[in-house]
């Protein structure tokens, strides 16, 4: 149900999303972050309320139904009624790994907790704005079945999920918000507040360059308020130059170090689980290359887009990153020379091969500007580079090379 786009993005923690909500005046309650049991106790006292909800801050959903790897302690969401209890629960969470359906068996390390004011919930709703590849538009996904995983609702009660395709410029207008509120069964004060909050969430989506704004649950309270109780935001990596606050949240310890290294050279790198590595110029061609590898019976080991940076330094760095992945058994370089000349890329590939000292088979397919000059350089290099005549041939040779076949 969520975004089908391959766009690179990163997640932020819930407490960080609450700060962004505050920036756009989205109603999200009182929220304080703590990184030690003592800070949790102090946060509880500062809230000056008879009770609070304490939540583990990790990059995953399903925290309430999770468990802690080291101790078996249940749940990453607890209700506490005193500062001492807040400290006790924080101690169970901090420094431990929370395992949920979304984390895998090793779980995720919790380094912070968030204390929030309890909300007297009348109904839990689901609300998300995301980019939809099928319609090539932003869409809203809304449901009266909030507080549970939306995939489960889609599987068992698809009729309870409503999809609204938005105008990319106008977004959630008052009219659209009223339509959504009606579908969610909001009435009276809750209806009016729902219309306002949905428009604020659209402004947040656009203003923060988000690729996904998911609120689950979006709570209708007993007194008619509409509150963003739990939220998950994703942001387009390409917006880093104008979203300084948001990208300042980025925890580099949670990011693959090779992705960080690639960024320094203007490369777009996403690790995958296969054994045929790709080094391509252009995101569209990179996707097509991965498809060809799959069609040939293989699995891509990465998405690596040189973009317009197909220089010797960029190619060398790409090879360096790829060659350090032990699961890579072959590399496929697929270049279409437009602005970038094939002879320049060929020279870069040859120099990079020698500098890195590649130990795995290398398949190269060149097409476009100065392609014959590029192919000549590769032929005369004396290196064991496997040339491919077309995209299909390249994919087949790369998969065979990964299996140990000789050419």
From Swiss-Prot:
Cofactor(s) for this UniProt protein: Mg(2+)
Question: Among the entry's GO cellular component annotations, what is one?
Answer: hydrogenosome
Q: Which PROSITE patterns match?
A: SUCCINYL_COA_LIG_3
Pfam families documented for this protein? ATP-grasp_2, Ligase_CoA
User: Which Gene3D superfamilies does this chain map to?
Assistant: ATP-grasp fold, A domain, ATP-grasp fold, B domain, Succinyl-CoA synthetase domains
Superkingdom as given in the UniProt entry: Eukaryota
Q: Where does substrate bind?
A: 281, 338-340
What is the stated purpose of this protein? Answer: Succinyl-CoA synthetase functions in the citric acid cycle (TCA), coupling the hydrolysis of succinyl-CoA to the synthesis of ATP and thus represents the only step of substrate-level phosphorylation in the TCA. The beta subunit provides nucleotide specificity of the enzyme and binds the substrate succinate, while the binding sites for coenzyme A and phosphate are found in the alpha subunit.
Similarity-based family: Belongs to the succinate/malate CoA ligase beta subunit family.
Record protein name field? Succinate--CoA ligase [ADP-forming] subunit beta, hydrogenosomal
């Amino acid at each position: 149900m969520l975004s089908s786009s391959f766009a690179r993005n990163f997640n932020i923690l819930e407490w960080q999303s609450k700060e962004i909500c505050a920036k756009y005046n989205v109603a999200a309650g009182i929220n304080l972050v703590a990184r030690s049991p003592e800070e949790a106790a102090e946060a509880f006292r500062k809230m000056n309320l008879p009770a609070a909800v304490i939540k583990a801050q990790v990059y995953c959903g399903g925290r309430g139904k999770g468990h802690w790897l080291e101790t078996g302690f249940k749940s990453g969401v607890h209700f506490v009624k005193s500062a001492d209890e807040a400290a006790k629960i924080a101690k169970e969470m901090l420094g431990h790994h929370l395992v949920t359906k979304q984390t895998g068996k090793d779980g995720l390390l919790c380094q912070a907790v968030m204390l929030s004011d309890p909300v007297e919930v009348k109904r839990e709703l689901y609300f998300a704005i995301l980019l939809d590849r099928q319609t090539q538009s932003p869409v809203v996904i809304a449901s009266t079945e909030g507080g549970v995983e939306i995939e489960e609702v889609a599987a068992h009660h698809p009729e309870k999920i409503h999809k609204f395709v938005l105008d990319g410029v106008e977004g959630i207008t008052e009219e659209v918000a009223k339509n959504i509120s009606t579908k969610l069964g909001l009435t009276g004060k809750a209806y009016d507040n729902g219309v306002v909050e949905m428009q604020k969430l659209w402004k947040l989506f656009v203003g923060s360059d988000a690729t996904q704004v998911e609120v689950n649950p979006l709570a209708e309270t007993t007194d008619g308020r509409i509150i963003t109780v739990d939220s998950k935001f994703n942001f387009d990596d390409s917006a880093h130059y104008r979203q300084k606050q948001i990208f300042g949240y980025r925890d580099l310890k949670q990011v693959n170090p090779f992705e960080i290294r690639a960024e320094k050279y203007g490369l777009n790198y996403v690790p995958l689980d296969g054994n045929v590595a790709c080094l391509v110029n252009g995101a569209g061609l990179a996707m097509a290359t991965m498809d060809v590898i799959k069609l040939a019976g293989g699995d891509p080991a990465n998405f690596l887009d040189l973009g317009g940076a197909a220089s010797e330094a960029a190619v060398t760095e790409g090879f360096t990153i790829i060659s350090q992945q032990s699961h890579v058994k072959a590399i496929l370089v697929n270049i279409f020379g437009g602005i970038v000349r094939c002879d320049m890329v060929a020279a870069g590939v040859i120099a990079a091969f020698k500098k890195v000292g590649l130990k795995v088979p290398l398949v190269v397919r060149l097409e476009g500007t100065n392609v014959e000059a590029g192919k000549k350089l590769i032929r005369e290099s004396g290196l064991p580079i496997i040339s491919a005549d077309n995209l299909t041939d390249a994919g087949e040779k790369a998969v065979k090379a990964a299996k140990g076949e000789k050419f």
